[in-house]
């Protein structure tokens, strides 16, 4: 499962009632951006699913057992169902029932939580310790910062609230070291920079450790 969040590009055509979608393409997003741009962020286990006849291919409705909520307390304090397209070509998400705990992110529409391949969704046991700590408090602290993607050199930050995200330049690709181990947080002096550490950042921090 690929934890992406961003632009969805559906390649296909719709004619005479037939939907010819062929692919789902998403732009990469740092987990912190995925967190800050989501209405709902929860840890949950899927306990059931059913196919509902909505749209050209239907909608999968997963029944979940919510373990913990990280974001969305005012939007939907308790989530029991999540909705996704039944077709993966439309960015529908396939989850295992009664097998894993997942980190789930998504948006709320008409009182329902929706998610898909372009959202940050990952098995809980696949998250790094830094990512788990980010969910608890660090990502929230960085929601006023901007993570700037770098695909080709040279890349520069253009304002003090930016962190340069260079995972895509690595031979290892995405998700890379910054995605797995760093959060972009506002530091002393009002500048945003990459942070990694075991204690939450506070006023005593002068310089962040850069990747």
UniProtKB/Swiss-Prot annotation:
Classification via InterPro entries: Netrin_domain (IPR001134), TIMP (IPR001820), TIMP-like_OB-fold (IPR008993), TIMP_C (IPR027465), TIMP_CS (IPR030490)
Signal peptide: 1-23
Residues that carry a glycan: 207
Coiled coil: none
Pfam families: TIMP
Listed SUPFAM superfamilies: TIMP-like
UniProt keyword list: Disulfide bond, Extracellular matrix, Glycoprotein, Metal-binding, Metalloenzyme inhibitor, Metalloprotease inhibitor, Protease inhibitor, Secreted, Signal, Zinc
Site feature: Involved in metalloproteinase-binding: 37
CC terms in the record's Gene Ontology section: basement membrane; extracellular matrix; extracellular space
Keyword Metal-binding tagged: yes
Domain NTR: from-to ranges: 24-143
Chain segments carrying region Involved in metalloproteinase-binding: 24-27, 88-89
Region annotation Mediates interaction with EFEMP1: where it falls in the sequence: 105-188
SMART domains, per the entry: NTR
Location in or out of the cell: Secreted, Extracellular space, Extracellular matrix
GO BP term, example: response to cytokine
Residue intervals passing through the bilayer: none
Disulfide bonds: 24-91, 26-118, 36-143, 145-192, 150-155, 163-184
Entry GO MF terms: metalloendopeptidase inhibitor activity; zinc ion binding
Quaternary structure and interacting proteins, as annotated: Interacts with EFEMP1. Interacts with KDR.
Its job: Mediates a variety of processes including matrix regulation and turnover, inflammation, and angiogenesis, through reversible inhibition of zinc protease superfamily enzymes, primarily matrix metalloproteinases (MMPs). Regulates extracellular matrix (ECM) remodeling through inhibition of matrix metalloproteinases (MMP) including MMP-1, MMP-2, MMP-3, MMP-7, MMP-9, MMP-13, MMP-14 and MMP-15. Additionally, modulates the processing of amyloid precursor protein (APP) and apolipoprotein E receptor ApoER2 by inhibiting two alpha-secretases ADAM10 and ADAM17.
Recorded family membership: Belongs to the protease inhibitor I35 (TIMP) family.
Name listed for the protein in its UniProt record: Metalloproteinase inhibitor 3
Organism: Equus caballus (Horse)
Gene that produces this protein: TIMP3
